[in-house]
């Protein structure tokens, strides 16, 4: 089917020890720059090039100079839409760190943080649960799901370092290019600008 929309959550709670480093309460030290920037990479990989973003931030809970919560609306060049919310003041199991199982420093919740919806079904990520109708597609028909049972590596960070070494040695081509990284930075910059102006910002 055709991808229509996505919903991404990065909800986690950072305790007071996290803020002993004073730069984390200053502009640039919040969940936008520390957490959301990684979700941008993955959203672009899953949904394609971004056309525009519009965002809003809040420091409702901690009242620091930096945001503690943000929401972003993405419009993709494909026409698909996606919403993303990030907060480091919410006690919850829905963030890439707590669902992917890539880093042993984080307890795994066996939940998902990404939900991608299309005209023939939807998928949760990273637990890869696929939802669909059998036969006629309708909200009046039963929903079914199946687990895709793809074995994911628990050594992802090590694999990334090994891949980087192979690229440096000329043994492999980068899976993520410099252009990909630059595009993510452009999107991040647009999100910051939008949070200040309240306007929708186009990505060039």
Q: Which stretches of residues belong to each language-model region?
A:
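Residue-level signal for the nucleotide or nucleotide-sugar donor/cofactor binding architecture
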Residues: 34, 156-159, 176
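Hydrophobic alpha-helical segments typical of transmembrane helices
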Residues: 38-42, 112, 160-163
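Active-site rim elements
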Residues: 29-31, 148-152, 170-174
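Residue-level detector of conserved, well-ordered beta-strand and adjacent loop positions
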Residues: 7, 54-56, 85, 117, ...
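Residue-level detector of beta-strand structural context in well-folded domains
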Residues: 70-72, 112-114, 174, 192
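C-terminal helix-rich "cap/oligomerization" subdomain common to oxidoreductases
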Residues: 125-126, 163-204
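Predominantly a Rossmann-like dinucleotide-binding segment in NAD(P)-dependent oxidoreductases
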Residues: 1-65, 70-74, 198
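NAD(P)-dinucleotide binding in Rossmann-like oxidoreductases
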Residues: 63-67, 77-159
């Amino acid at each position: 089917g055709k991808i229509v929309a996505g919903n991404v959550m990065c909800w986690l709670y950072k305790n007071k020890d996290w803020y002993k480093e004073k730069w984390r309460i200053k502009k640039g030290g919040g969940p936008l720059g520390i957490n959301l920037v990684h979700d941008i990479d993955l959203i672009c990989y899953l949904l394609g090039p971004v056309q525009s973003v519009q965002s809003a931030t809040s420091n409702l809970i901690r009242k620091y100079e930096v945001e503690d919560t943000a929401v972003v609306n993405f419009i993709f060049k494909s026409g698909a839409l996606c919403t993303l919310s990030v907060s480091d003041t919410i006690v919850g199991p829905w963030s890439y760190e707590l669902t992917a199982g890539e880093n042993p420093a984080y307890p795994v919740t066996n939940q998902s943080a990404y939900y991608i919806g299309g005209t023939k079904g939807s998928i949760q990520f990273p637990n890869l649960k696929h939802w669909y109708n059998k036969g006629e597609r309708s909200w009046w028909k039963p929903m079914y799901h199946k687990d895709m049972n793809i074995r994911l590596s628990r050594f992802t960070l090590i694999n990334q370092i090994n891949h980087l070494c192979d690229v440096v040695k000329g043994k492999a081509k980068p899976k993520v290019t410099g252009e990909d990284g630059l595009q993510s930075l452009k999107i991040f910059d647009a999100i910051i600008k939008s949070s200040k102006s309240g306007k929708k910002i186009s990505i060039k």
